[in-house]
Amino acid sequence: LKKLISKYHITLISLGNGTASRESEQVIVELLKEIPVKVQYIIVNEAGASVYSSSKLATEEFPQFDVGQRSAASMARRLQDPLAELVKIDPKSIGVGQYQHDMNQKKLSEALGGVVEDCVNRVGVDLNTASASLLEYISGISKAVAKNIVAYREENGRFEARNQLLKVAKLGPKAYEQCAGFLRINDGKNPLDATGVHPESYAAAKTLLERLGYTTEDVKERRLDGISKKISNYKKLAEELGVGEITLQDIVKELEKPARDPRENMPKPILRSDVLEMKDLKPGMILKGTVRNVIDFGAFVDIG
């Protein structure tokens, strides 16, 4: 492990919270005391990792790895981009409470799938890096179309504009209308493609920028922070631009902070370098925790 840390300049270790997690944590802590460079670790929820590691998708992604190695790779990816990795498994595999197996499984699957879809669309997806597993949760994109997008990207190179999606097999105008606003293109031909502004609203967005003394280049350089303060009457301006008031508010939010990630407002993960034990806990301490399970007599909260 020391050799791997030195060879690949490791600075952060992802440690699963499953079987022998505590023992593994102790080994890592002792190891970190012996090396000169600063390396930290974080406990990652490994629910569903075994399901992924034995799946067809995992075999396709890591044909040269065994099941254990695939699980390890998944743990590391969950730390890098949890949303992109967790979409690869059935949400039921994560564990959603004591009574999940007593429910109507069809309705449960539909509800959980809807939540995942809402999360993916709310965050948005980078069109040039997203896997087919992630793309298929975007509104208007089926599994087949998601694979076609990846195939088009591999054959023709990166997407430079959103409207290139219309060249993808089986992705028609209606599907494009549904998905375009949730797909981002960084460093593309049009800076608006990197925002959540829908192509249907591009004309209104450009007119708005001109009125406020800006250009799309200012969007690219992120020089539009605070433009909402320059608008005194949203209703009147929306009528002049030919869009709804709520649509205008959404456009302004996107222009102010393009490619903003709603997850940025969530508590940051705790990076650690030593083990937290029961004896370290004192009355009155305030700790951050994750609810792992809710049962009839209470809840299990993981505080590390």
What are these regions (language model features)?
Residues 81-152:
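Charge-patterned, long linear interaction tracts outside catalytic cores
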Residues 280-304:
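S1/OB-fold single-stranded RNA-binding interface
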Residues 4-11, 16, 30-38, 47, ...:
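Conserved, well-folded catalytic cores of nucleic-acid-processing
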Residues 12, 54-67, 96-100, 118-120, ...:
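Short beta-alpha connecting loops at secondary-structure transitions
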Residues 1-113:
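Phosphate- and other anionic-substrate recognition elements at nucleic-acid/protein interfaces
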Residues 263-285:
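Short boundary/loop segments of OB/S1/cold-shock single-stranded nucleic-acid-binding domains
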